């Protein structure tokens, strides 16, 4: 419990310190992937909801089709879509699931799919673009992954000339009647 509280306390500074490098990486990647019409976002365990959120953000502001999947489900259909023009954004944190995520990345690459891997320092990955973000305690990696994915979506949209402040067909709030 003490370890988690200490890690949580340090997160704001850790995120603040990481943001400039995240923006720089997102700006570097956006022209390289701007011609893609679709993206996969893959994650396992705690990273699966992050993959869903990353795909949603890319769709919302860049208008690029994106789907988030649990990495383990990739072989149940989505893998058929992988090709050189269909990049994959893989969340590959240094946790117990890393070997399985790495295996999924290799599967994508075997089908000539380009991979951006968002990973922690020391990740043993050989991908087209390894995007290293600082490590955080356990599930707190999410707090560092989310801004990176949001900046990637933002920079993609900006590079493509989209209005990032007023995405088309989106309401600022949702009401249920």
Show which residues each predicted segment covers.
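Short alpha-helices
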Residues: 1-6, 127-177
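Glycine-rich phosphate-binding loops that contact phosphosugars or nucleotide phosphates
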Residues: 1-10, 91-134, 152
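Active-site phosphate/pyrophosphate-binding segments
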Residues: 1-87, 160-177
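Residue-level marker of positions within ordered structural domains that often coincide
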Residues: 63, 113, 157
